[in-house]
Amino acid sequence: MKQFKSHCLPVHIANEGMESISAFLDGEERQQIDNAPWHDFGNLPQVSFSLAHNQQGIYLKYRVMEKHMLARYKNINDPVYKDSCVEFFIAFGDDEHYYNFEFNAIGTALCGYGEGKNDRKDLPVAILATINTLSTVEHQDAETGLYNWELTLFFPFSVFIYHSISDLTEQQCSINFYKCGDELPEPHFLSWAPIKHPYPEFHLPAQFGLVVFE
C-alpha cells in the first residue's frame, strides 16, 4: 500500500494566514499525482501536493501544470470535476464511509460523504464555506504552452461533520488524491495511489493509500 507521512504545521504559522501556510507547505515533501491507468494519448498534467496538520485541522497544497484549463463553476457543490479539478478522498479509522473533497482551480468546492459513489450526501454549504482557500493562476506560458496554478486549502476539523476530531497526531487514515478534467479538450484522470479498474473511477476506497500523521 502506498503511504506517506504528514508533519505538524506550527499553530503560529497557521495563524498568520493562508500565504504563510502556503509557504510552509512549499517546504514539505511533494507527493506526485502521476498514476494514469486510463491514459492512451495526449498530454498529461504535472501535479503534486503537500499535506500537513495540527490541532486546528488539515492543510493541503496542490501544484498543477497543464495544457488546458477550465474554471467555470463558482457555486459550492457545482460539478467542479468537469473543470480543471483536484480532489482528495479520506476515511478515518475503520470507517467504511469516506469524504470526497473536489475543487476547481479557483477553489470552488464539491464535497460529500458516504460508503460508495452512489451513496453520497453533499456536505452543507455553510460547512464547506469554512474551508479556507488560496488560489493562484498564471496565464498560459508563451514558451511551454502550459497553465500553472496552485491551490492551498485549510480544512478545519469541524468540516468532518460525521466525526469528532480534535487531533490526528499518531493516527493513520486511508486516503487518495486525484486530478481530473472531464470536459477539458483532452480529458485526464490521475491518482496518487495506483488504481486498477477497467474505466476511470475514483470512488474505490479499497484502493486508497495511507497517510500517517506525525
Features from the language model and the residues they span:
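Structural preference for beta-rich elements and adjacent junctions enriched in aromatics
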Residues: 1-214
